[in-house]
Amino acid sequence: PLVNKYENKIEVNETKKNFEKTVEKLQEESKEEDSPLNKLYSDMKAYNEKIYKDKQSDLKDPWSYEQSSFDLTKYGVENNIIGYIIVPHMEIELPIYLGANSDNMAKGAVHMSQTSLPIGGENTNCVIAAHRGYKGIPMFCDIEIMEIGDEVIIKNLWETLKYRVSNIKIINPSDSQEVLIQSGKDMVTLITCHPYTKNYKRYVVYCEREKDDEENNNQTVSNETVTANKEDKPKKLSESQYRILFDRYSPLVGVVIMGLLLIVLIVTGKKKK
């Protein structure tokens, strides 16, 4: 797992460099009104407006849409990466791929089709999913440490959008109504499997766009209660968190034990001589 984590960090950094080069190139071309980047933004905005107007009628099961509604390669964007998600409290930075298929989810976070695309704006809710962990790579592994008021940052092809956690729920996989757009709001919603390794529920973190005069407190949690605010957050670790800690540190403990056994064998061998 430690090797996988290190290799993934290198891969993510390389992917990020390539993405930034693509953004730089597209932004240079965007000075022309009919540039691919301007066209992409216009098309994405129109898509967001349409699904809101249609009340996301096509959204039955957000996990069943493996293909994206957009092919970014048509606009000059490689690998179907629309941006990055940064969560300081979880210490993660992941690429956001369009299309929730297994290949994309093995590499980073994914945008759930039939939800708002990650460009912000009123009447939007971009749902972003990721594994709790994949082959030792953390991803949304530590999502349960998230608290009301925590910052979530989205860097797309055009700008950086900042959000704050406003609500947390544990839902059933079929509860698609729990990830619908909320009228008048600009939101990003993080979702992952729960509990860790069992995966029969979904852990959902709702985030609302930052406002200069907004105070991020006194928020409540509905459905199955997880936390209400920073002061009320329970200190006891959940079953998932215990499992995560075990998976994270058991290889290290194993190495230490093997080292101690080796030392004992060496010392015992010398005494016999």
Question: Which sequence ranges carry the predicted segments?
Answer:
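Conserved PLP-enzyme active-site core in the AAT-like
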Residues: V256-G259
